[in-house]
Design a protein with these regions (language model features):
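Gly/Gly-Pro- and Ser/Thr-rich, intrinsically disordered tail segments characteristic of DNA damage-repair
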Residues: 1-225, 235
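DNA-contacting surface of Y-family translesion DNA polymerases
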Residues: 194-337
Length: 338
């Protein structure tokens, strides 16, 4: 069984940890240039502020509902993420940190009531960090993602922890989930699925494997098998290396500088944590990004830059600062980065 733990409204929740008077008040976090909304509390969502919204278009709502607006503080969020992930590592020896606010745990061999185990995790994290989380548990990673979505969507019914542990639950969940909300499907594949009348995850699962392989490649086929309950998407666990690095393929193509910088911040923070764990320091930093190689009709771009640091460090704040400087030098507009 796998558990997917997701921090709820992470950036907004981090701001509330350090200012509890914000609890119950609409909170939004803006990108570093204060251009777009990149995080919203549930209260902000309820008054109609969408993710990615240009801030100036919603200033009237900010004033009307007394919304508290913050500029993104990525070093703070990275530090809070490390605290959460460190506590979660106590619940399984096999952890994959998927993003700044998500991680997978492999629960193989842990023979307990998994619903209660999830609730125990939730209570421990919220007590230890102040960050609210949701937990989804299932036989595969894709199903754990789905279970997490249910836990987050129906907190009163689930308590924030939901387990897909029967065929009946799996089928019911697949009938509920829209294809565009399936982990890793993306807009492009969702359009293909809609075109053939596949609107729910159950429709995708019931498609022939030949069609999925032809139209969605081996990645889509592995996803389909995972949703069938056949473990196909494996855990990505850290390796012990003298050269420390963190890289991931983005879940969706990213175009804006702020979106890419957010991911770079997350990965740099994770690398800094690895440095400190083995009492090491960094003297050189390499930042690299790349476009989607499967979009052959678009211009490909795979830049990298090596930065010689003025002093050895394992400080998240320092490394993030240098990583941002490097990204500014290699980032080009009008590319979709993967």
């Amino acid at each position: 069984m796998y558990a997917l733990i997701d921090c709820n409204n992470f950036y907004a929740s981090c701001e509330r940890v350090f200012n509890p008077t914000l609890i119950g008040i609409p909170v939004v976090v803006l990108s570093n240039n204060d251009g777009c909304v990149i995080a919203r509390s549930n209260e902000a969502k309820a008054i109609g502020i969408p993710m990615g919204a240009p801030a100036f278009e919603y200033e009237h709502l900010f004033r009307r509902y007394k919304v508290k607006v913050f500029s993104a503080n990525f070093p703070l969020y990275g530090d809070m993420s490390r605290r959460v992930m460190s506590l979660l590592s106590n619940y399984s020896p096999h952890q994959e940190i998927y993003s700044i606010d998500e991680c997978f745990l492999n629960l193989e061999g842990i023979n307990v009531d998994l619903q209660k185990y999830g609730l125990e995790m939730k209570a421990r994290i919220e007590k230890g960090t102040g960050i609210p989380i949701s937990i989804g548990t299932a036989p595969t990673k894709a199903l754990a993602k789905l279970a997490n979505r249910i836990a987050k969507k129906f907190p009163n019914e689930t308590g924030g922890s939901y387990v897909i542990d029967t065929e009946e639950k799996r089928i019911k969940a697949l009938k509920w989930l829209k294809v565009e909300d399936i982990w890793g499907v993306g807009r492009r594949n969702a359009k293909k699925l809609y075109a053939i009348g596949a609107y729910k995850a159950i429709d995708f699962v019931n498609l022939s494997e030949a069609w999925v392989l032809k139209n969605m490649t081996i990645t889509g086929l592995n996803l389909q098998k995972d949703l069938k309950g056949i473990p196909t998407i494996e855990m990505v666990e850290p390796e012990k290396k003298k050269s420390i690095g963190t890289s991931r393929t983005f879940e969706t193509d990213l175009r804006s500088f702020d979106e890419v910088r957010e991911r770079i911040t997350t990965f740099t923070s994770m690398s800094a944590e690895k440095l400190r764990e083995q009492n090491s320091f960094c003297k050189r930093l390499i930042v690299f990004i790349g476009t989607n190689p499967f979009k052959e009709h678009e211009t490909q771009y795979y830049p990298s830059i090596q930065i010689k640091l003025p002093f050895p460090t394992n400080s998240t704040l320092e490394l993030v600062k240098f990583a941002h400087e490097g990204l500014k030098q290699i980032f080009k507009k009008n590319h979709y980065y993967k």
